[in-house]
Structures are given as structure tokens and as C-alpha cells.
Amino acid sequence: MLNFVSTPIGNLNDISLRAIDVIRSSDYLYAEDTRNTQKLLNFIKIKKKCKSFHEHNEEKISKQIIQHIKNKKIISVLSDAGTPAISDPGYKLIQKCIHHNIKYTLIPGPSSVISGLLMSGLPTN
């Protein structure tokens, strides 16, 4: 199973209980900046290593992730802040999953796009 896990934008208290459960149950964690993710893991008191997944190793790591999924491992890709695959490498992994008929899910949470829209005062109806 592949999870794309949204993470807090600035305030670590904004992490969802569902996100914590998914992170805790994951066999492997991947993130663009493992230093940011390690701060979050420390905050939620989960002792797991996080592997780097960024534009420079995206092809190699995507193959690893797909192999882990085929081996029935639970994988979570975490954003540095907000929703994965928005301004980070996750979208290419999603394309590969679609191509290989691999199921994936999003653990929703903070989104800078929605926050920006709300703070702009523009009509949303």
C-alpha cells in the first residue's frame, strides 16, 4: 500500500490523528527533506528512519518504492509541508503507480492552496 501523507504547514500540532496512525504503521517512510520529516517524527514520538525522495533520485527511489509495494510493504511519502505531489516529486510516482496499476491513497491535511484562497478574501462560492 502506498500512502501520500499531508503534513503541517508551520505548526506541528496540525498533524492529523489519521496521519500519525498511517506513519506509525508504515514499513518505509520517504520525504523530500528528511530533516523536516525527522522534526515531525520526533514531535509525534515515532522512531522511524526516513529515506530521501527528491528530484535528483526520483527515478531510482520510485523503482524501490514500487518494488516494496509489490512485496506487500506499507509505504508512506510525506510532504515537507502540506500535501505531497504539490511542488515536490510525488506526482511522477503517482504516474508510475497508475501505469503499474498500483493502488495509492492520500491522507489529506493542510494545503497552502486552500489556505491562500481563504486568506485572500476572494469569493469561494
Pin down the residues of each PLM region.
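Glycine-rich, flexible N-terminal cofactor/catalytic loop recognition
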Residues: 1-56
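Short, glycine/charged-enriched secondary-structure capping and boundary segments
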Residues: 18-21, 43-46, 66-67, 89-94, ...
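Structural motif
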Residues: 32, 53, 78-80, 105-107
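Short gly/pro/ser/thr-enriched loop/turn and capping motifs at secondary-structure boundaries
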Residues: 37, 84, 111-114
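Glycine-rich, highly charged phosphate/nucleotide-binding loops
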Residues: 57-66
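Ordered, amphipathic secondary-structure segments that act as subunit-interaction surfaces
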Residues: 71-89
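Class I SAM-dependent methyltransferase SAM-binding "motif I" and its flanking Rossmann-like core
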Residues: 92-125
